[in-house]
Amino acid sequence: MKKNKYGFLIRFLMKICLWGVAFFLILTYVIGFFRATGNSMFPSIKDGDLCILYKIEESHTNDIVLYKTSDGKERLGRIVAVGEQKVNFPEEGGYTVNDYQPAEEITYETYRAEKSDMKYPITLEKDEYFILNDYRSDTSDSREYGVVKKEDIEGKLIFILRRRGF
C-alpha cells in the first residue's frame, strides 16, 4: 500500500519537473520579454511598455526587433534594410534604400547621425540589417552604432503590454 502512495508522489513530482524544464526552455529559446525604456520607438512603443518577443522567426524589413549594440546594450528598433541593400542619407534629409524612399505609415524626419563615422551610401552584407528608431531624432541606432549582424538580433516583437495609458 505504501508503495502506491510513493509511486503517485514520484510521478507527480516528475510531471512538475518536466513542466518546469519545458517552461524554462520556452522562455530561454522561444519567447523573450523586454521592458522598453526611453522614447526611441515612440509612438509605436512607449517608455515602460512590456514587449514580448519571438526568438525563432527570421526578421524582415519593417519588423521591430530587440538587438545588441556594439557596446553591449539591448535596444529596440525597426529594420529598414536587409542584406545586400544599399542605404543612403542624402544631405537634404530623409533616407533611401536602393535609391528609393521607403513608404512609411508615419513620415519621420530622418537625418544622419552627427557623431558617427559611417560613410554613405553603405551596402549591407548578407545577414546584416540597418535599423532605425521610430523617433528618428534619437540617432542611437544603426546611424550611430553601425549595421546589426543577424546573430545580434535577439527577437522579433510580437506583442506589447501597455503599462501606462493607451
Regions found by a protein language model. Name each.
Residues 13-21:
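Sec-dependent signal peptide hydrophobic core
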